[in-house]
Structure formats: structure tokens, C-alpha cells
Amino acid sequence: MFSRYSSWEALPAAWRENKRQSAEWLLMRIQRHRTTKEPNEPFRILSIGSGIGYMEKLLLDAMPDLELYVNEPSTVGLKWLRSYLPADRVFIGFPPLCLPPDVSFDMIYISAVDYSIATRDFLFLLEALRAQLLPGGELICLSSSYLQEDSYIGSFVNAIKIVIRAVLHYLGVRPQQFWGWRRTRREYQQLFKQAGLTVEEDGWLEKTAETYWIVGR
């Protein structure tokens, strides 16, 4: 990708606009949450699966004093973002194993990566991240792989997905090589509750109806 694009600004405009809307929504929540802290108290936030870091760059542009930490499995993806952050705020690897157990956060968000995580592993991740929240902290999931529930299409897609996974499993092929995990609103709420989180609220980004969000404490 980096051989094709020279900077964030060179990326497709539609993709950047989608990320910008998500970042603006996060900024709104951060600003609201910061009012509960002392003026000089740092606000510590962790991004899980930052990718190439465009949303994080937008957050830092808007709030230069934000104590932002990022996680990404690959060192390559953060090539552009590294100049924005101290080295000790970058965690490379798979969470929660790569995260320092002695650091807690006011907010942790997972954006558009949960589709790549099997349900059992996603539950384990939510439980581990909940343990790293400061009192009153928020755990947020932004999902662009949301599956409409109570619809014929949604039920049909789920049924086909189950059949394909069974066939691939029988053939000895790991299904996550080809298919992600799409979840309904009810499934997200259930996973958050199973992880010991209280679901504060959930909904859809106003300008991007396909992006679902859920907040737990």
C-alpha cells in the first residue's frame, strides 16, 4: 500500500470521509468524558487495531495534548503515524498480550476490526480490555460489518455463512482466511454483557448509517 500511496491525503476520498466521520464522533465522546476529570488531568485513550492510523492522526490534530496509545499487529501499518507518537505509546502485537498490564485508560476503542475476530476470541478481548479501564472509563466498538437483525436477508446471510464455514472446516481450511464475523445489534449487546460490561448506549453514526457503535463501562 505504501508503494501506491505517499500519504494519508492520497488515499481514496470516500475512505477518508468515512474515517473522518468516525473520528469526529469519537472526539465528541472524548470532549464529553473529559469534563468529568480535573482540568490538568491527562486523558488516556487506547486504539485497538489502528491500521494505518488515519483516525488517530485526526484525533491528535484536533487534540494535540491527548495521551493517545495505539495497537497494531504489524509494524508496517503505523509507518506514517509513528512520527506523531512517542515509542512507548505504540504496542505492536495481538492484544491483550502486547498491552502493559500496569497502564489503565479512560477510553479504549475498537474500530472496524472486530469482523476479523472470532466470537470466542472477541469475548476474551472485551474481558481483558474491561480490566484495563480506569473507573468510569468507556470501552467502545465501532463496526462497519454490522448485520441487520430481524430481516430475511440478515437471516439468509447468517445461514449461508454457517454452511460455508462447515464446508471449509471439513476441507481443513480455516474459515477466517476468507470470511469475517458479522454480528447483529443483539449479539454485540450480549457480548458486552458477557464480558462484564454495562451497555451505556448504542446506535449508528448519523452520516454513516452502516457504522454501528456500542459503548460499555
Placement of each model-derived feature along the sequence:
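A conserved beta-strand element that flanks and buttresses the S-adenosyl-L-methionine
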Residues: 109
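Short N-terminal helix/helix-N-cap motif within the alpha/beta-hydrolase-1
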Residues: 118-120
